[in-house]
């Protein structure tokens, strides 16, 4: 399925049913009085977050949603049936904005979250409700009010704990394939990854975290070059970034330090708080270098970047160093959760 992270939809809530003008007519009761019932309320439209969806692509083919209209009231004080609500399922992580006014309506960050986006119309009142001591036979009823109608802009920001950054062909897709059940395309050319991928990384029997892989960044990405910048927003919800660097980039011939600096520069230019997130350096493809060259190459990259945060040496293809990396990531995330819980208390 094609990955789509923005869509526009139209939602129409149901109108309220009209109140009824009716009078009781029975044998031997010539003046039965008013018995017109109220109408039913119109159905409302809700968005519901679901972990079973990961794209907004379906809304390209079905973009207009309507809730049911309330039924009109009838005689014998019968109230009209309320219209059924309309529930629209969207991926968890969807941000909802009124396309006409720009109003931020909500952010569906947890599976099962429900957001009211169009309220159904209020029911009309039947003439039985207007009877009084001075008006025994009212010939008055009110119509139902119209339901709300909106055009909504939906934007999906994937929810992941850890995000992967790096130049094209740095091995990000190989890494997420190696540590999770995600199966992004892997090939020996740039921009193999064309859209974000999510994978659940399991550490032990009971613990896990979600990892996101986005297309590689190139110089000028913040101004629109390449593919990665349009997907950087999917990393804004992450708690940790792993900067993957190819330590033996024989295909591109780009010095690893230069490549890493370009990614960092694009991250800072794009902004939105990504440059402030915790970031670990992951030196990939260590299986390609002889042991005596590996140490000097790693030291050259670390010194060239003036890197003081954690550094990991891995081979995503061979599986080297992955166990330590995933366990340390899990430990870091758990420490963050405990710190967050303590601050809330």
Swiss-Prot record:
GO aspect biological process, one term: ribosome biogenesis
Domain Obg: start-end pairs: 1-159
Region (Disordered) residue spans: 128-148
Main location: cytoplasm
Domain of life: Bacteria
Keyword Membrane found: no
Matches recorded under Gene3D superfamilies: GTP1/OBG domain, P-loop containing nucleotide triphosphate hydrolases
Keyword Repeat: no
Binding sites annotated in the UniProt record for GTP: 166-173, 191-195, 213-216, 284-287, 315-317
Molecular-function GO term, any one: GTP binding
This protein's UniProt keywords: Cytoplasm, GTP-binding, Hydrolase, Magnesium, Metal-binding, Nucleotide-binding
CDD domains: Obg (cd01898)
PROSITE patterns recorded: G_OBG, GTP1_OBG, OBG
UniProt subcellular location: Cytoplasm
E.C. numbers: 3.6.5.-
Domain OBG-type G: 160-334
Cellular component annotations (GO), alphabetically ordered: cytoplasm
Family in the record: Belongs to the TRAFAC class OBG-HflX-like GTPase superfamily. OBG GTPase family.
Biological function: An essential GTPase which binds GTP, GDP and possibly (p)ppGpp with moderate affinity, with high nucleotide exchange rates and a fairly low GTP hydrolysis rate. Plays a role in control of the cell cycle, stress response, ribosome biogenesis and in those bacteria that undergo differentiation, in morphogenesis control.
Record-linked NCBIfam families: Obg_CgtA (TIGR02729), PRK12296.1 (NF008954), PRK12297.1 (NF008955), PRK12299.1 (NF008956)
Protein name, entry field: GTPase Obg
Source species taxonomy: Bacteria, Pseudomonadati, Pseudomonadota, Gammaproteobacteria, Methylococcales
């Amino acid at each position: 399925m094609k990955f789509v992270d923005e869509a526009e939809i139209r939602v129409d809530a149901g109108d309220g049913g009209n109140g009824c003008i009716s009078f009781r007519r029975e044998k031997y009761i010539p003046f039965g009085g008013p018995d017109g019932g109220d109408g039913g309320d119109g159905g409302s439209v809700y968005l519901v977050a679901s972990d079973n969806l990961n794209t907004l692509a379906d809304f390209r083919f079905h973009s207009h949603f309507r809730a049911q209209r309330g039924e009109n009231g009838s005689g014998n004080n019968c109230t009209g049936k309320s219209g059924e609500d309309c529930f629209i399922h969207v991926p968890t992580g969807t941000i909802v904005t009124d396309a006409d006014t720009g109003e931020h309506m909500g952010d569906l960050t947890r599976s099962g979250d429900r957001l009211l986006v169009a309220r159904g119309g209020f029911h009309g009142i039947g003439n039985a409700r207007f009877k009084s001591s001075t008006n025994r036979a009212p010939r008055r009823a009110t119509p139902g009010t119209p339901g709300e109608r909106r055009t909504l802009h939906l934007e999906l920001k994937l929810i992941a704990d850890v995000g992967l950054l790096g130049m094209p062909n740095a091995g990000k897709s190989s890494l997420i394939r190696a540590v999770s059940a995600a199966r992004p395309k892997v090939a020996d050319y740039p921009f193999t990854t064309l859209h974000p991928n999510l994978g659940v990384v399991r550490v032990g029997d009971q613990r896990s975290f979600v990892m996101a892989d986005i297309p590689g960044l190139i110089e000028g990405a913040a101004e629109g070059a390449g593919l990665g910048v349009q997907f950087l927003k999917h990393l804004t919800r992450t708690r940790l970034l792993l900067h993957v660097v190819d330590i033996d980039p024989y295909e591109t011939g780009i010095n690893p330090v230069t490549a890493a600096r370009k990614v960092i520069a694009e991250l800072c230019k794009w902004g939105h708080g990504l440059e402030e997130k915790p970031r670990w350096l992951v030196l990939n493809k260590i299986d390609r270098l002889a042991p005596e060259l590996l140490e000097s190459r790693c030291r050259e990259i670390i010194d060239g970047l003036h890197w003081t945060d954690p550094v990991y040496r891995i081979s995503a293809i061979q599986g080297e160093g992955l166990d330590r990396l995933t366990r340390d990531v899990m430990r870091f995330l758990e420490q963050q959760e405990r710190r967050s819980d303590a601050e809330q208390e």
